[in-house]
Amino acid sequence: EPLAGFRHAKALEHRTKIDWAKQMKWLADEVYPNAEKIIMVCDNLNTHDKSSFYETFPPAEALRLAKRFEFHYTPKHGSWLDIAEIELSALSKQCLGKRRIDNLEDLNSELEKWHTDRNAMQKGVDWQFTTDDARIKLKHLYPIVTF
């Protein structure tokens, strides 16, 4: 959550639709239990889709989760990717360094410490890129419409 300075990192053995759906359920039920709508910005990985809920949970639970989330997908080049890359860089420098972590349990312990400390500092990202900025900087992507 860039503006609030919240992040959560967890390493899993695999990156399947089921793994992702369970993480989204945790986010909905544990982190944002009172939110009517959770807006997620995701990359275009094939697991990041509402269909993952239906492959993981019974239909009623899948529908409940699908209604709670609104997904927006990042373009291949864009400032949302920059935000993710900033966080990954901070994670790499502040938590992982150049050492090798031998197992998932130790890695998750290190990740927990890192994101707890970083969340306590409320290190957020104030994203300032507006539609007007986009029309100037990315004018080649905006068609010129004449009437």
Language-model features, listed with the residues they occupy:
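Short functional hotspots at interaction and active-site rims
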Residues: 1-147
